[in-house]
A protein has these predicted regions:
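Glycine-rich phosphate-binding loop signature in dinucleotide/nucleotide-binding domains
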Residues: 39-42, 78, 157
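Active-site segments of SGNH/GDSL-like serine hydrolases
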Residues: 49, 69-103
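Alpha-helical scaffolding within the catalytic cores
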Residues: 28-40, 62, 66-70
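Solvent-exposed loop/turn segments at secondary-structure junctions
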Residues: 22-28, 52-57, 63, 88-92, ...
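Structural recognition of the beta-strand scaffold that forms the well-ordered cores
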Residues: 16-21, 45-49, 82-86, 117-118
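Catalytic His-Asp segment of secreted/periplasmic serine-dependent ester chemistry enzymes
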Residues: 88-158
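Serine-esterase "nucleophile elbow" of acetyl-processing enzymes
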Residues: 1-23, 33-42
Length: 158
């Protein structure tokens, strides 16, 4: 885990990273799993990087926003600092859908006063050398780039 390695270098044995991500996860799926995760780990910081799979499935942006808001609320209720990492989706569903999808992250971050990394795949998306054959998901070469993008947000939350 690159994040754990970076944290261990700067803060030896002070922070434990729990990667609770699930491949193909939607905001609804995460919402069902989050209460138990919060209870089990009692995290100081929760990074929410979800919604992309909802968007690829054409889920209503309002539903995605509602789920993101609930994920933030549940985390904040447990006294965790929340970071929201935004996503963008391919233009398959049209400009209006894409804009509504992307605005979800801004709205939720402003409403709940959480830090927003606007686009977690900035510098990765669209770069064929950093994306898997599905043209959506980042490959192993992209991971250090994504860590460098996310780390200032994570470090600031500690």
């Amino acid at each position: 885990n690159l994040l754990q390695q970076r944290l261990d270098q700067q803060y030896p044995k002070q922070h434990k990273v729990v990667n609770a991500s699930v491949s193909g996860e939607t905001t609804s799926g995460a919402l069902a799993r989050l209460p138990k995760l919060l209870q089990t780990y009692n995290p100081e910081v929760v990074v929410i990087e979800l919604g992309g799979n909802d968007g690829l499935r054409g889920q209503p942006p309002q539903m995605i926003q509602k789920n993101l808001a609930q994920l933030v609320q549940l985390s904040q209720k447990q006294k965790a600092t929340v970071l929201l990492f935004g996503m963008k989706i391919p233009p398959n569903y049209g400009t209006a859908y894409s804009k509504a999808f992307e605005n979800n992250y801004k709205i939720v971050s402003q409403q709940y006063k959480v830090k927003l990394l606007p686009f977690f795949l900035d510098g990765v998306a669209g770069n064929k050398t950093l994306i898997q054959n599905d043209q959506i998901h980042p490959n192993a070469k992209a991971q250090p780039i994504m860590l460098n993008l996310a780390y200032p947000y994570i470090k600031g939350a500690l």
